[in-house]
Amino acid sequence: MAIPTSLSLFPASPSSPPKPILAAPVKPSCVTVRFKNGGGLSAGEDLPLDYETWLPKRDVKNRRRAGILLHPTSLPGPFGIGDLGPQAFQFVDWLHDAGCSLWQVLPLVPPGRRADEEGSPYSGQDANCGNTLLISLEELVKMVYCQRKSFQNHSVADIKDPLVAENNIFVISGWLEDAAYFAAIDDTLNTFSWYDWPDPLKNRHLAALEEIYQSKKEFIDIFIAQQFLFQRQWQKVHDYARMKGINIMGDMPIYVGYHSADVWANKKQFLLNGSGFPLLVSGVPPDAFSETGQLWNSPLYDWKAMERDGFSWWVRRMRRAQNLFDDFRIDHFRGFAGFWAVPSEAKVATVGRWKVGPGKSLFDAIFRAVGDINIIAEDLGVITEDVVQLRRSIGAPGMAVLQFGFGSDAENPHLPHNHEQNQVVYTGTHDNDTIRGWWDILPQEEKSNVVKYLGNIVEEDISWELIQAALSSVAKTAIIPMQDVLGLGSSARMNIPATQVKKHAYAYCRPTQVLYLKSARNGNSGMELLRLKLSIHALVNDFI
């Protein structure tokens, strides 16, 4: 019944008589079932014989899925690290056979080359280029052989024109041209950073760039050709994964390295002084990983300048990510709401302070230019209310990590009963120890919490106990590091955050013990495949 408009929240004055409330005329109730063809049935009439088949359709976006975190460098390969060759395709087959539908990789960018970066893909030399170390020589030989055979049956124009057309797509990409010139100058001068280059090159004077082009033309052509080969091989792997029903999730660091084409070619988009040196650098305050915080030393964005430019730099970056991946995780998502800014001369991150990020205006600009994109927000660490609201406003799932769940109380957001459907749950990320390594040094109190929460567990099988917990979560996506599937210890850990130089080597390129690919027909690897397949089918596929 509608509420009469004369109804007031305040009592009528006692001196005035109460006004009568007139009831609205009552209409006869009638329930009508409408059909797609426009017809209908009234209450009490017979329903069609197929009525029991009118089941609600589930939204495909809410489909539960499971995946594996494994960087391509951890695949087996004859040259020290994995690549985009046959083993990458075999891994896709393995994912398909296991019932997985997602493969997460770390950033595919060229890794940092400085000593303090230890080859980290999170301090890459370029935000858009591919890591050419991933180019498979075996696939390259196959491609050359196939092209040579084609020459026997076709004219030169038939072969050359399509290849030139494909290559020109890359040549006209602004980011690739910037990266090629940057690499050519860097190869010529070999300084610590572009800040030390002569002013004409440092400030991109056209005459100086033309001189570099003339003197380093072969280098520039080879650089572009290598990126073309990377793109071609990656696209082949990506297309094969899609054919097998596997989405590939990339990883996008929020910041870029100072010694990069991104900063050199876009100085006005960063907080630099008049000579090009950073005013403020990135980091995070003290947290669970470090008592003094983490000093990342990446230059910070000039968000006001970026907004005036329509966030065009970010739009280009997102378009490139769309070209490479089906989904992608944005590392340190909280920096879009509020970011930690540290003076560039500081030695520790504790002297920084919080500053306001671009917020939803950045994503509004991206969505207008790019359309819908599948973002996963890395929302770990110090997560304030504005970060939560920003993530929800763009519909991006956050993250939960089981290893973080057992050290406090029942309100811990990483415990399974606190998970959300629109979330991605991990046993651990690349920054965590493996489950086996984590368990070996876990304080007894936390071990007791794990046992109480998960029930009767077998400690020798702790990796699989947590894998089962992740797959059982209400979160619609679960991702398991390959090291945990194999039950490996701390020696297989990918990274140790906030560790000082020379105390560790960034192990992202250490080949994992991938026995699952080498001997899938017998031994432990075959059993692990069967076990993962049964777990995923029981806990994911049967309940979508």
Each PLM stretch: what is its role?
Residues M1-T32:
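N-terminal chloroplast transit peptides
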Residues A24-T73, D83-F89:
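N-terminal regions that are enriched for targeting/export leaders
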Residues W54, D59-K61, P86-P111, R320-D327, ...:
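Catalytic domains of carbohydrate-active enzymes, especially glycoside hydrolases
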Residues K57-R64, H71, A115-Q231, Y255-I479, ...:
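Alpha-amylase-like alpha-glycosidases and glucanotransferases acting on alpha-linked glucans and related
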Residues H96, W234-R242, F367, R391-R392:
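Surface-exposed amphipathic alpha-helices with a cationic face
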Residues Q227-V256:
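Conserved, well-ordered alpha-helix/loop/beta-strand core segments that scaffold catalytic motifs
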Residues L486-S519:
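Low-complexity, glycine/alanine/valine/leucine- and proline-rich hydrophobic stretches
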Residues K518-I544:
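C-terminal accessory segments of extracellular proteins
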